[in-house]
Amino acid sequence: MSNIHDMEFLQKKVQELKEQGLYKELVTLEGPSDAECVINGKKVINLSSNNYLGFANHPRLKKAAIEAIEKYGAGAGAVRPIIGNMKIHDDLEKLLAEFKREEAVLAFQSGFNCNAGVIQALTDKGDLIISDQLNHASIIDGTRLSKADKAVFQHSDMADLERVLKEKRNNYNNVLIITDGVFSMDGDIAKLPEIVALAEKYNCLTYVDDAHSSGVLGESGRGTVDHFKLHGRVDVAMGTLSKAIGVVGGYVAGKKVTIDWLKNRGRPFLFSTGLPPAAVGAAIEAVKMLMESTEYTDKLWANAKHFKEGLGKLGYNIGHSETPITPIIIGDEAKTLEFSKKLFENGLFSGPIVFPTVPKGTGRVRCMVTAGHTTEQLDRAVKICEKVGKEMGII
């Protein structure tokens, strides 16, 4: 009889992943996340981070983080509802509310925590959550935690969304329609104006996850709501401090009454220690930089256009991305892993995305262009993609 502490059941599952070509090893950065970085001792062009604006290693953010530590210490010391709420937290939320053009904001420890806590706090038994088929895992898990009933509509299919509304709306108290602003695997933008129109037609609430559009879409990166000029018509806008902002954390923006409720019933907010001062100080500086100039967002979009054009000329399948997210769709899982491995060997890191993150048969390397990349680096990346693609018979 085997020893239960040997975790034999997990050993079998890990072995199955390896046999299926789905097992992934963690790579280790030996320095900051930047346009070029050192991974496992090798210097490579980094096309895998969510550091859209190049802020993660920006001198202004590092200086602000150090100053915040010197003033407030290394940690908050408690959950914010007890004695972990520092003035720097309030300053961040006030600035974010101004930036997002919303009444109020509440910051969470991560974007995942934000969705997991907010969705369940806003819905209850007798309510219905309607979610896009390709919404992020944090939305799926937040929905599971809710007592509300759930329904899913086909990805960005407004006819299917209206079908669900016609069938179900009258059976529930409140209905919450949730969508990603930008879908992280394909880079397409939600049809937010159409979603809002249907929500208003059927008297529903709307919730947009702006994780991949904060700092990317809208004026100076204000997000999807600003991109479509839907201020006052989207009830909840979630954002992250971990991607374009370059630090860590998440936040939700909306009406003051919504934020007041979440301060009392948002479980991750209630039961997790507040964000550390260094992260908050750096995030404040990043938002200030966005409010000062469009320099970084302009560079991001120019770089994305340049890189997409280069891949397009090679004949790669880059899907229907409308944002800097640029998938190179390979298909077969094992071939995707091999493609990513060969890119790395040639000086380019773009991590493989395979099942269960994306459906089987749609494996891809997801290239994340940033404002921090130079034209020379992007041209070099395209040449590496050309070399590997031809060697493997992909192009």
Swiss-Prot record:
It holds the Pfam family Aminotran_1_2. The modification N6-(pyridoxal phosphate)lysine is found at K243. Its EC number is 2.3.1.47. Keywords: Acyltransferase, Biotin biosynthesis, Pyridoxal phosphate, Transferase. It comes from the Bacteria. Pathway: Cofactor biosynthesis; biotin biosynthesis. The keyword Repeat does not apply. InterPro entries: Aminotrans_II_pyridoxalP_BS (IPR001917), Aminotransferase_I/II_large (IPR004839), AON_synthase_class-II (IPR050087), AONS_Archaea/Firmicutes (IPR010962), AONS_Archaea/Proteobacteria (IPR004723), PyrdxlP-dep_Trfase (IPR015424), PyrdxlP-dep_Trfase_major (IPR015421), PyrdxlP-dep_Trfase_small (IPR015422). Pyridoxal 5'-phosphate binds at G111, F112, S184, D209, D210, A211, H212, T240, L241, S242, K243. Substrate binds at K24, H136, T357. GO terms for biological process: biotin biosynthetic process. GO terms for molecular function: 8-amino-7-oxononanoate synthase activity; glycine C-acetyltransferase activity; pyridoxal phosphate binding. Its cofactor is pyridoxal 5'-phosphate. The keyword Cell inner membrane does not apply. Transmembrane segments: none annotated. It catalyses: 6-carboxyhexanoyl-[ACP] + L-alanine + H(+) = (8S)-8-amino-7-oxononanoate + holo-[ACP] + CO2. Homodimer. NCBIfam families: bioF, gly_Cac_T_rel, PRK06939.1. Belongs to the class-II pyridoxal-phosphate-dependent aminotransferase family. BioF subfamily. Catalyzes the decarboxylative condensation of pimeloyl-[acyl-carrier protein] and L-alanine to produce 8-amino-7-oxononanoate (AON), [acyl-carrier protein], and carbon dioxide. This is 8-amino-7-oxononanoate synthase. It comes from Treponema denticola (strain ATCC 35405 / DSM 14222 / CIP 103919 / JCM 8153 / KCTC 15104). The lineage of its organism: Bacteria, Pseudomonadati, Spirochaetota, Spirochaetia, Spirochaetales.
